[in-house]
Regions:
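Non-catalytic signal-transmission and effector/linker regions of two-component phosphorelay proteins
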Residues: 1-66, 131-138, 142-223
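Conserved phosphotransfer microenvironments
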Residues: 9-10, 36-52, 60-63, 67-114, ...
Length: 225
């Protein structure tokens, strides 16, 4: 694992917090079989855990989730609900329309991030990685930990906001270089929790509400390569 930190800006006083993190993920479409949905319920409700993570890390406006059972149902939902910001799909070998759905969305010019979760095995990894033109943005190994969902959300928010927040404003960036699905699926949640907790510690040094919001939004971006 290699991490590269860009230079820290000396002063954010001239940057208003509203200009940072302009893109936020507010609504997530979850594609998940009844069985996997049941397992997630057994592990703990994802929505509740993500909400608790947001509250625990002093983060506002947690996203809402829309649950469907198949790629076909997802297509219908996307037609009826144009405000979907992200799609997270639990890999299901029976549902053969998942990869065509992701590819079709990209072909239609829709820039909705499409993330695939899988219970890691070499056989499944080989099948997934063979879909080179699938339209899937990232593949993650699922261990039943809601921290990973939070990390995925923040990863794509950081990616969309990087050009302005980093290049124009001077926000720091941490580059995680890792090609192992299992490793980056483990590293990212821990890295985000560390960064967000440190940001909350820095809030104690601020003097007013605007300074707090500025520091909160100017936390280092995390990019995965």
């Amino acid at each position: 694992m290699i991490m590269q930190v860009m230079p820290r800006p000396e002063d954010f006083r001239n940057t208003h917090f509203s200009s940072l993190i302009k893109f936020r993920i507010k609504r997530i479409l979850m594609i998940c079989s009844n069985y996997d949905a049941f397992i997630m319920e057994e592990d703990g409700k994802i929505e509740s855990q993500v909400y608790k993570e947001y509250v625990g890390l002093n983060m506002s406006n947690p996203p809402t989730f829309v649950w469907v059972e198949s790629a076909a149902a997802a297509r219908q939902t996307l037609e009826n609900e144009p405000d979907i910001d992200m799609i997270i799909c639990m890999y299901n070998e029976i549902d053969r329309d998942i990869f065509p759905l992701a590819a079709d969305l990209k072909a239609e010019g829709k820039q909705i991030p499409f993330v695939l979760l899988m219970h890691y095995s070499k056989q499944i990894r080989k099948k997934v990685m063979s879909q080179t033109d699938s339209g899937v943005d990232f593949v993650f190994s699922w261990h039943g930990n809601a921290d990973l969902i939070l990390a995925i959300i923040k990863l794509f928010e950081d990616k969309r906001n990087a050009d302005y927040d980093i290049l124009e404003t001077g926000v720091q960036a941490i580059m995680l270089v890792e090609d192992s699905i299992r490793y980056y699926s483990t590293y990212l949640p821990e890295l985000y929790k560390l960064i967000l907790k440190q940001s909350n510690e820095f809030l104690k040094e601020t003097l007013n509400e605007d300074q707090q919001k500025n520091r909160k939004r100017s936390r280092p971006k995390i990019l995965l390569a």
